[in-house]
C-alpha cells in the first residue's frame, strides 16, 4: 500500500490517473535536462522539493538563497544549460534579489522557483506574504504567479523560452506557485503534456545584404577590431577565429567571452587594449553591449571607429552606439557568413602585428611582476604574488588552461583580470560588480565539472559576504580552492577615500582568521604570511579540497582600476582617462 501511495505521489507508475502539480513541475525540469537544483528548503516549496528528490534530482542545499542563484548562474554560464534555483516565500525570495539582478545584468538564463502562500489565505495576512513578482519583475524576463493547475506546464514552457532568449533578451525568470496549487491533482486530459518537450532554440540567419555590407567595411578598413561578449558564446569560437583570420582584425575579449580565442592567436592583443580602442577605424562587436566597461562606445573612447554590431538580441545591438550595419542573427552564423564573403580578401595585418608585439611584451612583463613584486611597506604580501604562485604551479599540479578560475572583489578583481590569463573558463561578477560571488560560483562550477580544478581568488571583504557557503562545499564535496587576499580593508574604496577625500572611514576590516573559519566548517585551511609559502599552501589546498588559503596581503597595493579612478566614480565615464577624454570632447563641442 505504501509503495502504491509513493508511486501516486510521485506521478510515476501505471496506476496514475491524475498528477499533482508539483510532480508535473519536477517532470518538466527533468525533461529539460535539469539534474540538480540549488536552493534552501521551506514549507511553501516542499511539494516540489519532495518530488525532485523522489525522482533522483540532486538537491544542493545552501546557506543563503542568494548563493543558490549564484550557483545556478555559474552552472548556466559554464555548461550552457539553463539552471534552476528554488527558494521559499517571503525572505527566501527577497534574499535572492541581488543575485537575480546580477544574473539579469549578465544576461544569464536561469529559472528561479519561489514559494507562495495558499490562495485561500490571500489578503488575510498569511505567513511570509509579500508581492514577490512586483519586486522581481524589473530584473527578470518574466515574473509570474501560477494559479491555474492545468496551465502550469504551459507557463513553465513559456518561462523557459523567455529565459533562453527565444523571445528576446536572455536572463533570469521567476515563477511561483501557491502551495495549495502545488498539491492539486491535474487529470490526464488537462495536463497539456505537449509542453514537456524541450525545444531547440531558434537560430536566426543574417541577411545577405548585411553580410556583404560588413565585408565591404572590413575591406576598406586599415585597423579593424573585433570585441566579443557573452553573446559570442553561442559559438565554440571556430567561426570567430575564421573571421579574425579572414579580416586581419585585432581581437579583444571580455570576461564574458574569455577562452573563445586562444591567447596564442595572432589577433589576441588584450594587453594592448587601450591602443586598440583608441586607434581602430572599424569596431565590430559580437554579442557585447557597449557598457561602461567599453566606455559606452563613446567617440571619446573610440575616436576613429565606424561601428558594426552583431548579436542575437537587441540589448547587444542598439545600446549607446548604433552601427553602420546591425545584424540581428545567431552570431556564429553571421561570423561564418562574413568570413565566407571575405574568402578572396588578403588582409593587411601590419597594425595587428604591431599590437601583438606590444601585447607579448606587456604580458611577459606583467607575468614577471607576478613573481617578483615586493611586499608592501607594511611588510605584507602583494596580491600579484598569489597569481605568480598559481603561474608557477602551472604544468605541475595545475593545468591553468583547464582550471576554472574565478575572481571576486574590488581591487582583487582588477588584479585578477590581469593575473588570470591562461584559464579558458573564467568567471567574475561581470558588469553589475556584485561582490560575494567567488565561493558560490566555485561550488556551482565544481559540481558541474567535478574532474576539473576550480580556484577562486577573492578579496576578504567579498569573501565575507558568502563565507558560510564553505559549509555547503564541505557537505556537497565540492572540490574548490578559495584563496582570500586578506588586506583587512575594502581597499578600492579605501584608496579613493585617501586620495580624493583625505579621510579614511568605514573601509577598514578586522584581521580575521579566514583559514580558521574554513576549518570550523570542516574544510582544509591555511594562513600564509610569506610569499615563499604560497606555492606549498596552494599545492596542499588542491590536494585537500575543499580548502581555503588565507593570504595576508598589503593595503599598499593599488590596483590598476584604483589608479584609473574606478572607486571615485567620475561624472561621464567609469575610468578617469576616459572621463577626461569625454570632458574634452564635450568642451570641443561647446
UniProtKB/Swiss-Prot annotation:
State the free-text cofactor note: Binds 1 thiamine diphosphate per dimer.
Indicate how biotechnology or industry puts this protein to use: This class of enzyme could be engineered to produce biotechnologically interesting condensations of formyl-CoA with aldehydes and ketones.
Q: Which residues form the active site?
A: 493 (proton acceptor)
**What keywords would UniProt list here?**
Lyase, Magnesium, Metal-binding, Thiamine pyrophosphate
Q: Quote the record's binding site residues for thiamine diphosphate.
A: 410-412, 433, 461-462, 487-492
* PROSITE patterns linked: TPP_ENZYMES
Q: Which reaction does it catalyse?
A: 2-hydroxyisobutanoyl-CoA = formyl-CoA + acetone
Q: What induces it?
A: 29-fold induced by growth on 2-hydroxyisobutyric acid (2-HIBA), but not by growth on acetone (at protein level).
Q: Where is this region: C-terminal lid?
A: 566-590
Q: Whom does it interact with, and what assembly results?
A: A homotetramer formed by a dimer of dimers; active sites are located in the dimer interface.
Q: What is this protein called?
A: 2-hydroxyacyl-CoA lyase
Q: What is the lineage of its organism?
A: Bacteria, Bacillati, Actinomycetota, Actinomycetes, Pseudonocardiales
